């Protein structure tokens, strides 16, 4: 029992049980999609969730992102920044639509922390949509430490 306690104390002292941010990215040569997400987190702590879309030549149409809706169940939030111009949801996906930004890059942040009642992590997926079909997608997993 003392060995287990010592390992937990050591892990905490070396920040192994703190928040770690991961990055998942993909490109098709023209469009790029990058997601930053809480790879390891603990309840009550602020975390990073961010999506970046880049496209040389800018954006002529709204940007539509789909996120598996169950991923957000572990968070308390103040919302998205910028706020979506339109949101819809089906049984699996939360669709976020944003007005086209100036320039070649779009960035959205999700201001959130892990709910105190969250005990298990989640798998996540972000899709950059092209109409009703995904153009690019990234997947990731958040693990919650005790």
Roles of regions detected by a PLM:
Residues 141-146:
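Short beta-strand edge segments in extracellular beta-sheet folds
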